[in-house]
């Protein structure tokens, strides 16, 4: 179940960033490296809080 949650989280974040092909991304890249802007950051943060009970600062979100 934990693996499923991680995949769901990855898919949700990729969708927010407009990434269609998950296989094509470098998992060592931060969200900022992948093109995260401030509005996307807020959306990622809200998704993490709402769907995964993770509360992160905007700085932490950018470093993901």
Curated annotation (Swiss-Prot):
Positions of modified residues (O-(pantetheine 4'-phosphoryl)serine): 38
Keywords recorded for this protein, A-Z: Cytoplasm, Fatty acid biosynthesis, Fatty acid metabolism, Lipid biosynthesis, Lipid metabolism, Multifunctional enzyme, NAD, NADP, Phosphopantetheine, Phosphoprotein, Transferase
Key word Transferase present: yes
Domain called Carrier: residue spans: 1-64
Recorded catalytic activity of this chain's protein: acetyl-CoA + n malonyl-CoA + 2n NADPH + 2n H(+) = a long-chain fatty acid + (n+1) CoA + n CO2 + 2n NADP(+)
GO BP term (any one): fatty acid biosynthetic process
GO annotations of cellular component type: cytoplasm; melanosome
Residue positions where Phosphoserine is found in the record: 38
GO molecular function, one term: fatty acid synthase activity
This protein's record includes keyword DNA damage: no
InterPro entries registered for this protein in UniProt: ACP-like_sf, PKS_PP-bd, PP-bd_ACP, Ppantetheine_attach_site
Segments passing through the bilayer: none
EC number: 2.3.1.85
Principal localisation: cytoplasm
Role this protein plays: Fatty acid synthetase catalyzes the formation of long-chain fatty acids from acetyl-CoA, malonyl-CoA and NADPH. This multifunctional protein has 7 catalytic activities as an acyl carrier protein.
Identification of the protein by name: Fatty acid synthase
Gene: FASN
């Amino acid at each position: 179940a934990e693996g499923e949650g991680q995949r769901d989280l990855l898919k949700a974040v990729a969708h927010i960033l407009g990434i269609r092909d998950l296989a094509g991304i470098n998992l060592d890249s931060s969200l900022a490296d992948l093109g995260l802007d401030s509005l996307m950051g807020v959306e990622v943060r809200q998704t993490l809080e709402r769907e995964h009970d993770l509360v992160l600062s905007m700085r932490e979100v950018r470093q993901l």
